[in-house]
């Protein structure tokens, strides 16, 4: 693996047993993602895009091959160490926001910092600044049930960015957003890829979003190909 890559996988594969049959979902995948790079993965429904994100993010175990995140081979780490690495080096935005319903927007964004033992005043200050950056400075005290779908997604994106990770993975990040808000998220990603050298890996059906990335990869037949 290149020591400059924030994410790398080699010969990555995933299969499932269905009775006597082995169903191959992904096979022989190769990928390197470098600081500041923005890559989109596109493909039809059921092609394995979400499975791939889960493997790359250490949320699932591959059947073959290896994944390296921030210089660490995920399969060589225990569950606790893997969780700490994800919290430090990776931000993840799901298609559905997965915000904690009992906490406010500010508290949700603070959570990764508090897990990493950042002092509460500093965590609140940094989370407030980031929520203001995504246009939600006036919604800090609102719980997810009091926010629109687009607002909840922006809170989730802020939460993914709060630790200033080297890599952010996003699963259909603009699917619930109007055009203006979606463009704002795209602009923020572009800015961070330049100013902070944050890398972004995005799974999307939105080709207008994919075309704004540096590279587009298509997942078909269980393999990644340049689109």
Swiss-Prot record:
GO MF, one example: ATP binding
Function: Part of the ABC transporter complex LolCDE involved in the translocation of mature outer membrane-directed lipoproteins, from the inner membrane to the periplasmic chaperone, LolA. Responsible for the formation of the LolA-lipoprotein complex in an ATP-dependent manner.
NCBIfam families for the chain: LolD_lipo_ex
GO biological process: lipoprotein localization to outer membrane; protein localization to outer membrane
Subcellular location: Cell inner membrane
Record's protein name: Lipoprotein-releasing system ATP-binding protein LolD
PANTHER family, per the entry: IMPORT ATP-BINDING PROTEIN, LIPOPROTEIN-RELEASING SYSTEM ATP-BINDING PROTEIN LOLD
Organism annotation: Pseudomonas syringae pv. tomato (strain ATCC BAA-871 / DC3000)
Domain ABC transporter: 7-227
Top-level taxon in the UniProt lineage: Bacteria
């Amino acid at each position: 693996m290149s020591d400059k890559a924030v994410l790398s996988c080699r010969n990555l594969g995933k299969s499932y047993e269905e009775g006597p049959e082995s169903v191959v979902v992904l096979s022989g995948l190769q990928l390197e993602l470098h600081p500041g790079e923005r890559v989109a993965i596109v493909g039809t429904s059921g092609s394995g895009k979400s499975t791939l994100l889960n493997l790359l993010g250490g949320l699932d175990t591959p059947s073959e091959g290896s994944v390296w995140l921030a210089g660490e081979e995920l399969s060589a780490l225990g569950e606790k160490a893997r969780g700490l690495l994800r919290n430090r080096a990776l931000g993840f935005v799901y298609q559905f926001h997965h915000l904690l319903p009992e906490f406010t927007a500010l508290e949700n964004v603070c959570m990764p910092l508090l897990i990493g033992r950042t002092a509460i005043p500093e965590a609140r200050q940094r989370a407030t600044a980031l929520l203001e950056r995504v246009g939600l400075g006036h919604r800090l005290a609102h719980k997810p049930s009091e926010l629109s779908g687009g607002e909840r997604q922006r809170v989730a994106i802020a939460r993914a960015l709060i630790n200033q990770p080297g890599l952010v993975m996003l699963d259909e990040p603009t699917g619930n957003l109007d055009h203006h808000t979606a463009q704002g998220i795209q602009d923020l990603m572009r800015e961070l890829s330049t100013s902070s050298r944050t890398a972004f890996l995005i799974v999307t059906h939105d080709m207008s979003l994919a075309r704004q990335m540096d590279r587009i990869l298509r997942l078909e037949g269980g393999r990644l190909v340049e689109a």
